[in-house]
Design a protein with these regions (language model features):
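Single conserved hydrophobic/aromatic residue that forms the stacking wall/gate
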Residues: 1-12
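A structural motif specific to WD40 beta-propellers
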Residues: 17-20, 78-80, 131-134, 182
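Conserved blade-ending motifs and adjacent loop-strand segments that build the rim/top face
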Residues: 23-29, 82-98, 130-157, 194
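Flexible loop/turn segments at secondary-structure boundaries
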Residues: 26-29, 50-53, 90, 119-121, ...
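Structural signature of eukaryotic scaffold interfaces centered on beta-propeller domains
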Residues: 31-38, 48, 94-107, 151-158, ...
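Loop/turn-rich, solvent-exposed surfaces of beta-rich toroidal or solenoidal domains
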Residues: 41-132
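Blade-level signature of beta-propeller repeat domains, shared across WD40, Kelch, NHL, RCC1
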Residues: 145-218
Length: 218
């Protein structure tokens, strides 16, 4: 976990084999991987320092404790960009990329993610090379003068709501509202998405493809 270069492999579920490997000189702890809904992109997260350090300060490198976004082209990983929640945090706020999930909006790639005491950030990575933040929530430090571990461990989207598990303060529940970045129709579509196969249950780590009701079916 202390290495700055780590390899990752992609697997086919029914017949696993390594398709490609990547390294990132800024990454310390390759923590998780999240595919977009159609499986053409993947987000890798770097939980720098195991999540217990302040790595979102104004002077911290933008590839420390960040996301790395890759397009999948001919079963190969092609690096496109890094993403780090943009608001600088205090030295008393542990802050790195952590658990999140896709918000299933047709023809777009939207990801909600926990950043410990950095709060939550909703990222639009439809353009893999230019990800942007389209929504956020940040409580501020638990203690202003002392760094203690806290903040969001995970933020998961499910049928219209974002559930944030805050280590010290409990569970927060959020609802998306229309904005210049998200329309009322897109928010409704995300709420109505369901698994392409199998029962209508949710486990963010399964990352099953989602589909939407056809027009006039509701």
């Amino acid at each position: 976990h202390g290495h700055h270069r780590r390899q990752r492999q992609m697997c086919i579920r029914d017949s696993p084999k390594r398709l490609d490997v990547v390294t990132d000189i800024g990454f310390a702890y390759w923590h998780s991987a999240t595919f977009n809904n159609d499986g053409t992109k993947v987000i890798f997260t770097d939980e720098w320092g195991g999540g217990g350090r302040a790595r979102c300060r104004a002077w911290d490198p933008l590839d420390w404790g960040a996301d790395a976004i890759y397009d999948i082209v001919d079963n190969k990983l092609e690096f496109r960009s890094h993403y780090k929640m943009p608001a600088p945090q205090m030295e008393t706020e542990n802050c790195v990329a952590h658990n999140g999930s896709i918000i299933p909006i047709p023809n777009r790639d939207i990801f909600v993610q926990a950043w410990y005491q950095g709060g939550l950030s909703v990222m639009d990575f439809t353009d893999s090379s230019n990800p942007i933040e389209i929504a956020y929530f940040d409580r501020g430090p638990i203690l202003k003068d002392l760094l203690i571990s806290g903040g969001y461990w995970s933020t998961y989207y499910y049928e219209g709501y974002i559930y944030g598990t805050e280590i010290k303060r409990g569970l927060d529940v959020f609802k998306l509202l229309p904005s210049e970045y998200l329309s009322k129709e897109e928010i409704a579509a995300a709420k109505n998405a369901y698994p392409a196969q199998g029962p209508r249950v949710f486990n963010p780590q399964q990352q099953v493809p989602l589909v939407w009701p056809s027009a006039g079916s509701e």
